[in-house]
Amino acid sequence: MTIIRVKENEPFEVAMRRFKRTIEKNGLLTELRAREFYEKPTAERKRKKAAAVKRHYKRIRGQMLPKKLY
């Protein structure tokens, strides 16, 4: 649970920004979005495997030598 103590004479916008930053740092929003709807275990495995393949190809693309530009 995220608790933000509002300091004296602190504007609401500043407190809200601090709250958003701490929630983002804790990863609560991403977890909330992931748990919003039930995902079948097979669908979850399929999504994670597709993400791993995408990361793999992205890593390979970064290691490739650039084509000669002449």
Swiss-Prot record:
InterPro entries linked: Ribosomal_bS21 (IPR001911), Ribosomal_bS21_sf (IPR038380)
Q: Supply one GO molecular-function term.
A: structural constituent of ribosome
Tell me one Pfam family matched here: Ribosomal_S21
Q: Which UniProt keywords apply?
A: Ribonucleoprotein, Ribosomal protein
Gene Ontology process terms (BP) = translation
Single GO cellular component annotation? ribosome
Establish whether keyword Ribosomal protein is in the entry: yes
UniProt lists the family membership as follows: Belongs to the bacterial ribosomal protein bS21 family.
NCBIfam families per record: S21p
Q: What is the designated name of this protein?
A: Small ribosomal subunit protein bS21B
Source organism per entry reads Burkholderia thailandensis (strain ATCC 700388 / DSM 13276 / CCUG 48851 / CIP 106301 / E264)
